[in-house]
Structure formats: structure tokens, C-alpha cells
């Protein structure tokens, strides 16, 4: 191992949402004097307004700290801040590949949660040295010994050295830094070997093009050097190199073991994919990093501007978003009901909410979003297989030989008293129980196979509400399985509204159709004629609701007298309504599209 690297430590922080990861990062920055008290705003590394507000980390961030340890040596610590949410699992795994160690933060009041576990296993897969930290010991309900035991039982890590800390109060921070220095191994790698570096994040800067966050494993990268990206063989010239300490500053070179920023005239963020390998164009390395994959979106929804005039603006906004987010995809689509818009693909539900919120917030757009759907695999009668992300594109029933839908393996961590409610929820969502094991006396881990389409709606919210917020969920894609699915169309006055159609399981179709019609009846305003709302599978109508018409009291000026006079007036009114119905079109409000989303309650 090169002597040069012995002072470098690359580490990340693993934690479940809200266990205090970003606060701990802030304290480390302050303790090492990287950030002055004046600059230290809360959650320093979460740059996006949205990240701060939701208290989650979306993009990976890095920062370099200088630290003088108790042994009198100066160390360079590179903290790689990873997203903790399950939607961004691939980004987490790439960030881990760039480290040698990880701080495992566990909340002293909550114990080990599902996402903590998922990330720990990933860290162990990458052979990282794990430093456990028990955070939030300043809270009255903290149970340090219980959590220590739990770390040993559930994860199987030795927790006798676990540092009790409180990031908020700044307790135990020095001890954590000492442990990083002594326990996390220094990076290996030869600065003179052919260049080999991994990209673990990239974003778009309007002045410099694509900025890549890299960890150099072998060799050295310098300005003016020609580099090659492994996955697409494209070559670029390095413009500038830098590190975040914590604000960007330029450096002359990045050597094996270092983490930094490379700017190299790359124009398209899709060229610099997360997990790709960078090497020297003149003397390339033998082989790339294993495990590179192009992330595929799992959840799709239509996004339409409420004002047709905003279409161009929406397109620009999506383009800018996709510059920073290579996992997000979009393509134009038209809907008879909603006009022109886009079909967007996301990694998962959180990702979808974030993208939609950023569109509305950063680009001030008023949008309608259709119900999220997943990618179905359709085999038609001729044997051709097609992937369909939009219910409107489903071929007619006669032509479908089989329909398959994606399934997830879900790991749910919960308190023992909530098991019944959670099992019931999973059963309702067509889940198949795979495993149930008790972790100690208070916690339980439940494993289920659940179709993605059932999770997409509001599974997460429901899980949180049946467990009073204590359950946590982690999932991975298991594969496709055949299912008895049908397309449910919604007709309004006999006209199908494409944006309201959904693909559902046949057993659920009646219930779902009825619920949908009832919901729509509440949100579609009364017209001058009656409006029929129907749910149909193919040509068979399975549910109907009617929105009654407004009517003027035409009999107000008849006093007593003959019934035939009244009948004449009523018949005349009826004729008029009938004529109106032939030419009238029903305005469908935004709430109607949201009604499709919230059917389950």
C-alpha cells in the first residue's frame, strides 16, 4: 500500500430516515473546523430546498475534512453522504463502492429499522468496516443498552464499542472521529497504475456541463488528460478537478484513494451514469468495476399541464430535471381527456413525489398527474412480448395470451404488537407470506411477496398508519409473475376517458369500479343534464352512478288546474335536457384524476 494514502479515510454514514444522519454530518464538519459556526446551516449537505424540507437526502454529496487525531497525525476524511431511501438503493450501493468504511447510525429510541438493515447488508457486501453509533442519547426515551443488544442480535455486529452520541447536543463526536481514523482502513491503490475511477454521482452545471463525483481507485487523473467512460466508450478531455471542502475548490490532481469532482466537457448526464468506470484513453485499465447497471424506472405516470399553453415550459422543466437525474425518464404522450403531456418514469413512489413537487415548486407549473402504473409484460396470441407502462396502450382482450406483472419482495420491520394489522394489510394487497421472524422480544421482521401495482398506490402510508408510524419497509424487485388482470375503463356519458383507466386484478375489479364511480360522482359537478358514470371491463359495464341534473322548477307558475298542462311543461323541459346532453361535454375537474389515486380508503 502506498505510504501516501495512509492518512486518507473514505467513509459514508448509514441510517434509516430520521435517525439523525445529516445532523451527525453537520457536527463532524463543525468539529473538524471544516465549516464555521456561521456557515453551518442545519443539514449542510442537503442542498436542495426539498431535501431539507422533507429531511431526506436525495443526491449523494461528498465533503473533505481535515482532522488532527489524538496521535498527532493529520488525516484527510472524505465523507460520502448517501441517500437513505429505498428508491435510491442503487445510488447507495455505488456510493458504498467508493468507501472503505461506514458509520452506522441507530436511533437510541427506535432501534434497528428496515432500511438500516438493507443498507448495512449492502455495506457488508462491499466489505466495509462498520462503526456503530447510537444516536439521540439525550432523549428521555433513549435505551442505549437495548439498542446495543439489538445491533448484535439483528445485524450480528459487535456493538461493545458502539459510540453513544447525540449529534444534536454534540456529544461523542470526537470519539466517532477517532474510531473512523483507527478502524476504517486506508484506501489501497497505486497512483502510477492505469487510471481506474468510479462515478458515484453526476449532475449538470449550466456553466461547466456535467460534473462527476468520482472515487479514484488506481492511477492519477490530471487536467488536460484524455479519459474514457467504460459503458459507452466515449472519450473526453478533463477540464478541471476539484474537491468539496465543503465548498468546491480546484486541485491539480486526484490520486488513487482520493474522492473528488471531475469536469470534462461531458454535455449529457446520461453519458456519465452512476456506477460507470472512468479510465485513461491512452492506457486503459484491464476491466471495469463490477455491478454497473442502467437503472430502469419501475413506476410510471402521466404528467399534463392544466393550461395547454404551459406545454413548452413543462418540456423544458422535464429536460432540466432529467439532466440531473439519469434515472428519471420521460416521453411525450397525448390523452383525449387531458391533451398533450408526458409519460414519466420513476424509480419508486418517493422519487415520483419528489419529481412532481420539484416541477411545481422550482418551475411554478400547475399540473395534473394520472394514477401511477407499473410496467406490465404482455404476451399476445402470436407470441410477441411487449412491455406496457400505460393502461391505455393495452391491446384488446382477444389478443392477449398472458399478462404478467412485477412482484416485489418486501421486508417489513415492526413492533410485535402491530403484526396482526400488518399481516392483514399484506393479505389485502394480494401478498404471499414468505417469512416471519422475531428479533428479540419487541421487534419482528416480516417478508412478503407483493405485486408492485399494489404497493404503488398507498401501501406505504397504510403501513405507517396501521403501525402508528413504527413499521419500516424495504423492498427489492423479485421478477415478473403471471396474474389475472383486466383493464377497467371509466365511461362518462358513454365516452371512455383514457386518463382514468386502470389495470386491476379481476377479483378486485367490481369493488374498484364501484368505488371509482362513487368517488367520481362526488367530484364531477352537476350539469344541466344528467351525467352517467360507468365502469366497464371491455364491453361489460360493471358499475354505474348518475350525477343528477340541475332543473328549474317549470311548474312554479301553474296554480292548480289540469295535470296535462303540467305534463306538457315537464315533457318540454325533458326534451330540452335531452338535446343539451347530445351536444354537451362534461368538464372533468382535477379532483377526478386524484380520485383514482385515493380509492382504497
From Swiss-Prot:
Binding-site residues for GTP, renumbered to this chain: 18-23, 135-138
Keyword flag Membrane: yes
Keywords: Cell inner membrane, Cell membrane, GTP-binding, Hydrolase, Membrane, Nucleotide-binding, Protein biosynthesis
GO biological process, one term: positive regulation of translation
UniProt similarity note: Belongs to the TRAFAC class translation factor GTPase superfamily. Classic translation factor GTPase family. LepA subfamily.
Function: Required for accurate and efficient protein synthesis under certain stress conditions. May act as a fidelity factor of the translation reaction, by catalyzing a one-codon backward translocation of tRNAs on improperly translocated ribosomes. Back-translocation proceeds from a post-translocation (POST) complex to a pre-translocation (PRE) complex, thus giving elongation factor G a second chance to translocate the tRNAs correctly. Binds to ribosomes in a GTP-dependent manner.
Name of the protein described by the UniProt record: Elongation factor 4
Originating organism: Anaeromyxobacter sp. (strain K)
Taxonomic lineage from the root: Bacteria, Pseudomonadati, Myxococcota, Myxococcia, Myxococcales
Name of the coding gene: lepA
Amino acid at each position: 500500500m502506498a505510504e501516501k494514502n495512509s492518512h486518507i479515510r473514505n467513509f459514508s454514514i448509514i441510517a434509516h430516515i430520521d435517525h439523525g444522519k445529516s445532523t451527525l454530518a453537520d457536527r463532524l464538519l463543525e468539529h473538524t473546523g471544516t465549516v464555521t459556526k456561521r456557515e453551518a446551516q442545519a443539514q449542510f449537505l442537503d442542498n436542495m430546498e426539498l431535501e431539507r424540507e422533507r429531511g431526506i437526502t436525495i443526491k449523494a454529496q461528498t465533503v473533505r475534512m481535515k482532522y488532527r487525531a489524538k496521535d498527532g497525525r493529520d488525516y484527510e476524511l472524505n465523507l460520502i453522504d448517501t441517500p437513505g431511501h429505498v428508491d435510491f438503493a442503487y445510488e447507495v450501493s455505488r456510493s458504498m463502492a467508493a468507501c472503505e468504511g461506514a458509520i452506522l447510525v441507530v436511533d437510541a429510541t427506535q432501534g434497528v429499522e428496515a432500511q438500516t438493515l438493507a443498507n448495512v447488508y449492502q455495506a457488508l457486501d462491499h466489505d466495509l468496516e462498520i462503526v456503530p453509533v447510537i444516536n439521540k442519547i439525550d432523549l428521555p426515551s433513549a435505551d442505549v443498552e437495548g439498542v446495543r443488544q439489538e445491533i448484535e442480535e439483528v445485524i450480528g455486529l459487535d456493538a461493545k464499542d458502539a459510540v453513544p452520541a447525540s449529534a444534536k447536543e454534540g456529544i461523542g463526536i470526537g470519539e466517532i472521529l477517532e474510531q473512523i481514523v483507527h478502524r476504517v482502513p486506508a484506501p489501497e491503490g497505486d497512483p502510477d497504475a492505469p487510471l481506474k475511477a468510479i462515478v458515484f454521482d453526476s449532475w449538470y452545471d449550466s456553466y461547466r456541463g456535467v460534473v462527476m463525483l468520482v472515487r479514484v481507485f488506481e492511477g492519477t487523473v490530471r487536467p488536460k488528460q484524455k479519459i474514457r467512460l467504460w459503458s459507452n466508450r466515449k472519450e473526453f478531455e478533463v477540464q478541471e478537478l476539484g474537491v468539496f471542502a465543503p465548498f468546491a475548490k480546484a486541485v491539480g490532481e486526484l490520486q488513487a484513494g482520493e474522492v473528488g469532482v471531475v469536469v470534462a466537457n461531458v454535455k449529457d448526464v446520461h453519458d456519465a451514469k452512476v456506477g460507470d468506470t472512468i479510465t485513461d484513453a491512452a492506457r486503459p485499465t484491464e476491466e471495469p468495476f463490477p455491478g454497473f447497471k442502467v437503472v430502469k424506472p419501475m413506476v410510471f405516470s402521466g404528467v399534463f399541464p392544466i393550461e395547454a399553453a404551459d406545454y413548452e415550459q413543462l418540456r423544458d422543466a422535464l429536460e432540466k430535471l432529467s439532466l440531473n437525474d439519469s434515472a428519471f425518464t420521460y416521453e411525450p404522450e397525448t390523452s383525449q381527456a387531458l391533451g398533450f403531456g408526458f409519460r414519466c418514469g420513476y424509480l419508486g413512489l418517493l422519487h415520483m413525489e419528489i419529481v412532481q413537487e420539484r416541477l411545481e415548486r422550482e418551475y411554478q407549473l400547475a399540473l395534473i398527474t394520472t394514477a401511477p402504473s407499473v410496467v406490465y409484460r404482455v404476451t399476445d396470441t402470436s407470441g410477441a412480448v411487449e412491455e406496457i407502462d400505460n393502461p391505455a396502450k393495452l391491446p384488446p382482450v382477444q389478443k392477449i395470451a398472458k399478462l404478467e406483472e412485477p412482484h416485489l419482495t418486501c421486508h417489513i420491520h415492526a413492533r410485535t404488537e402491530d403484526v396482526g394489522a400488518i399481516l392483514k394489510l399484506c393479505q389485502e394487497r394480494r401478498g404471499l407470506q414468505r417469512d416471519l421472524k422475531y428479533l428479540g422480544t419487541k421487534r419482528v421482521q416480516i417478508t412478503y411477496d407483493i405485486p408492485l401495482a399494489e404497493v404503488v398506490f398507498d401501501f406505504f402510508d397504510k403501513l405507517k398508519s396501521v403501525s402508528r408510524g413504527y413499521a419500516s419497509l424495504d423492498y427489492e424487485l423479485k421478477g415478473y409473475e403471471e396474474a389475472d388482470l383486466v383493464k377497467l375503463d371509466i365511461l362518462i356519458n358513454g365516452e371512455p376517458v383514457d386518463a382514468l383507466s386502470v389495470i386491476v386484478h379481476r377479483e378486485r375489479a367490481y369493488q374498484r369500479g364501484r368505488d371509482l364511480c362513487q368517488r367520481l360522482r362526488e367530484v364531477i359537478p352537476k350539469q344541466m343534464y344528467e351525467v352517467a358514470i360507468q365502469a366497464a371491463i371491455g364491453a361489460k359495464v360493471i358499475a354505474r352512478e348518475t350525477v343528477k341534473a340541475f332543473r328549474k322548477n317549470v311548474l312554479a307558475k301553474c296554480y292548480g288546474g289540469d295535470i296535462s298542462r303540467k305534463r306538457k311543461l315537464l315533457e318540454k323541459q325533458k326534451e330540452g335536457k335531452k338535446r343539451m346532453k347530445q351536444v354537451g361535454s362534461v368538464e372533468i375537474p382535477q379532483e377526478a384524476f386524484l380520485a383514482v389515486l385515493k380509492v382504497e380508503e
